[in-house]
C-alpha cells in the first residue's frame, strides 16, 4: 500500500506546481500588457482609455477633444446608471508616463477642467501611479476616480479589452490513479 501512495503524493505536488505555473503565466501576461501600454503614443493611450471606459458604460460625445492644448481633459461623455434614471456627465484625463507619477498639480488642473465642463465626476487614468498628494487632491471637491497602472491592467482583463481569453486544461490526477 505504501508504494501505491508514493506516486499519488508526487502527483499532488505536480498539481501545486501547475497552479504556480498558472500564476507565473498571468504575471508574465501582465508584464507584457504593461509594456504594450507603456509603448503607446499619448494619442493612442487616450484612444485606449476611451475604449476601456466605453466598455464600462460611458458614452463619449462625437465632439473630439484636441490632443494638444486640451484644457486638461481628453474626452467627455455620459454614463447612464443601471436603472436608466440618472445620467451623469463624465470627463477623463489620460497620462501615459514611463516613470514619473501623476502629481498634485496634474489633479488640480483636471479639477479646473472638470468645473469648466460642469462634470458630475472625472476619471483620471495613468499607466503609472499617483503620488499621495495627488490622491489627497482627488478626494476634495468633485469626485474623481483614479485608475493607476495596476487598476488599468485589472480592468483590461475584467472587460477583455483588446485581449483574447484562453482556456487551458489541467489533468486531474486524483481521478486517474489506479485503485
Kindly label every feature range from the protein language model.
Residues 1-177:
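Mixed-charge (Asp/Glu-Lys/Arg
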Amino acid at each position: 500500500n505504501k508504494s501505491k501512495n508514493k506516486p499519488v503524493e508526487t502527483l499532488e505536488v505536480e498539481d501545486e506546481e501547475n497552479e504556480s505555473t498558472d500564476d507565473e503565466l498571468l504575471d508574465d501576461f501582465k508584464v507584457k500588457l504593461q509594456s504594450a501600454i507603456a509603448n503607446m503614443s499619448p494619442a493612442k493611450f487616450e484612444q485606449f482609455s476611451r475604449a476601456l471606459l466605453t466598455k464600462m458604460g460611458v458614452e463619449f460625445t462625437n465632439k473630439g477633444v484636441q490632443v494638444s492644448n486640451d484644457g486638461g481633459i481628453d474626452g467627455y461623455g455620459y454614463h447612464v446608471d443601471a436603472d436608466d434614471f440618472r445620467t451623469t456627465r463624465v470627463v477623463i484625463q489620460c497620462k501615459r508616463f514611463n516613470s514619473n507619477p501623476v502629481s498634485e498639480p496634474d489633479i488640480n488642473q483636471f479639477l479646473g477642467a472638470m468645473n469648466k465642463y460642469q462634470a458630475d465626476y472625472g476619471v483620471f487614468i495613468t499607466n503609472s501611479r499617483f503620488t499621495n498628494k495627488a490622491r489627497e487632491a482627488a478626494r476634495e471637491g468633485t469626485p474623481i476616480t483614479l485608475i493607476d497602472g495596476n487598476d488599468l491592467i485589472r480592468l483590461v482583463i475584467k472587460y477583455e479589452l483588446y485581449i483574447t481569453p484562453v482556456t487551458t486544461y489541467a489533468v486531474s490526477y486524483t481521478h486517474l490513479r489506479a485503485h
